[in-house]
């Protein structure tokens, strides 16, 4: 059961981000390789050292946020269909990772990150606790904040949302980022 929860937590965290895109009526097929690029960056740039996590994780977040923003920009501003843009980004990221790694596996993760998957609090793995906290935060953002209402408005009818004063392009870019 522990393994099921750990695997579910990882997929659940990714699904939280995907939820924002789907609510706007979009789709993001690049999420798997976006996650893989992030994992590669953390494992190789941090060099298995907890001390390097201070800059490694923020750098990974900036890079993946930027790649997601590129998806969102091309979809909302350049009007590239979401399935085409995100599938194209998926292929680009896959090729980039194969070129960077030359087909060899990356380094091991820093001990602090390994702790997230191996240790627990009151029998609940740390990663599952993080997933629960992130789920609560996303649910609050969706149902108690303006941002969530904007996402739902765009998903229902982007044209009406635009005429009602919502900056549709910016909101879509942010949802993909």
What positions do the PLM features span?
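Membrane-embedded alpha-helical core segments of multi-pass
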Residues: 9, 13-17, 38, 63-70, ...
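Hydrophobic alpha-helical elements at and bordering transmembrane segments
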Residues: 5, 9, 45, 92, ...
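Transmembrane helix-bundle core of multi-pass membrane transporters
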Residues: 1, 78, 82-145, 171-174
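Alpha-helical transmembrane segments within multi-pass membrane transporters and channels
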Residues: 50-90
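Internal alpha-helical transmembrane segments of multi-pass membrane proteins, especially GPCRs
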Residues: 6, 10, 34, 58-59, ...
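Single transmembrane alpha-helix segments in multi-pass membrane proteins
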Residues: 1-49, 73-79
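Helix-loop-helix "hairpin" substructures at the membrane interface of multi-pass membrane proteins
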Residues: 54-60, 66-71, 122-177
């Amino acid at each position: 059961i522990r393994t099921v929860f750990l695997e579910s937590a990882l997929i659940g965290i990714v699904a939280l981000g995907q939820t924002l895109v789907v609510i706007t009526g979009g789709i993001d097929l690049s999420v798997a390789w976006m996650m893989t690029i992030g994992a590669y960056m953390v494992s190789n740039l941090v060099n298995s050292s907890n001390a390097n996590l201070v800059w490694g994780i923020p750098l990974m977040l900036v890079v993946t946020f930027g790649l997601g923003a590129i998806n969102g920009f091309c979809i909302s501003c350049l009007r590239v269909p979401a399935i085409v843009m995100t599938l194209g980004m998926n292929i680009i990221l896959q090729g980039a990772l194969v070129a960077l790694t030359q087909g060899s596996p990356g380094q091991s993760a820093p001990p602090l990150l390994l702790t997230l998957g191996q240790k627990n609090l009151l029998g609940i793995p740390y990663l599952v606790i993080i997933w629960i906290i992130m789920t609560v935060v996303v649910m609050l953002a969706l149902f108690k904040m303006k941002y969530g209402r904007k996402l739902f408005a765009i998903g229902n009818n982007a044209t009406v949302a635009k005429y009602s004063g919502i900056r549709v392009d910016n909101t879509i870019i942010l949802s993909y980022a």
